[in-house]
Amino acid sequence: MSTQGLVQLISNAQCHLRTSTNYNDVHTQFNAVLNYKNKGTNTIDGSEAWCSSIVDTNQYIVAGCEVPRTFMCVALQGRGDHDQWVTSYKIRYSLDNVTWSEYRNGAAITGVTDRNTVVNHFFDTPIRARSIAIHPLTWNNHISLRCEFYTQPVQSSVTQVGADIYTGDNCALNTGSGKREVVVPVKFQFEFATLPKVALNFDQIDCTDATNQTRIGVQPRNITTKGFDCVFYTWNANKVYSLRADYIATALE
């Protein structure tokens, strides 16, 4: 399995981190980023890992998000500047930050065996949560780790609305018979990042028919991220003087 296409939650500052304890103020969650290096030039950058001050199975590091995320994988790494790493751990998570669940009923997950090798664990099924925590169970010399959580990208709904798409007066639908159409190009106010869905509704209808049956339609055609063609149409003996429509375009980005 691959992390390609997934979001690195911690590295991209998409969450808040909190720890149970810190060895001191240069062994904190700040140092827990995967592949973190202190550059070896001074002590200000601190340890190449988060290190707990208490060494027992009650320690943890938790990532909390503003909105629910879909967690796919957790990555673990040891301390880069000492022979300290977590050899097994469990995962706990919560969707509402009130009720917590244990992944695999709290079963141990294999950790790492050296300072710098990154070990990924892909969850059996995606975990939907606001907060997720690593709880070390066993360790080499000290509880020290660097880590990352991989999630699905968060998509949000982006909507644009437009009005007054007009065929013009006495348009081409007002003459002839059979299937006829008028195409009006529409440009969005700004370009979507992904292809939107477009819905149209009539705002004004001006037409007649000797049989008292009004046959008209409107639909989008040739939709792109920049715009679409608004197609007004009629058929049979309908005479359409003019039509006007509004649109709603929505995309997940």
UniProtKB/Swiss-Prot annotation:
InterPro entries: FA58C (IPR000421), Galactose-bd-like_sf (IPR008979), Galactose-binding_lectin (IPR052487), H-type_lectin_dom_sf (IPR037221), H-type_lectin_domain (IPR019019). A motif (Cell attachment site) lies at residues 79-81. SUPFAM superfamilies: Agglutinin HPA-like (SSF141086), Galactose-binding domain-like (SSF49785). Keywords: Acetylation, Cell adhesion, Cytoplasm, Lectin. The keyword DNA damage does not apply. Stalk cells. It comes from the Eukaryota. One of its GO terms (cellular component) is cell surface. It holds the Pfam family F5_F8_type_C. Coiled coil: none annotated. One of its GO terms (biological process) is cytoskeleton organization. GO terms for molecular function: carbohydrate binding; N-acetylgalactosamine binding; oligosaccharide binding; polysaccharide binding. Residues 2-152 form the F5/8 type C domain. The modification N-acetylserine is found at residue 2. Tetramer of four different chains (A to D). Galactose- and N-acetylgalactosamine-binding lectin. May play a role in cell-substratum adhesion rather than in cell-cell adhesion. May be necessary for the maintenance of normal elongate morphology during aggregation. This is Discoidin-1 subunit B/C. It comes from Dictyostelium discoideum. The lineage of its organism: Eukaryota, Amoebozoa, Evosea, Eumycetozoa, Dictyostelia. The gene is dscC-1.
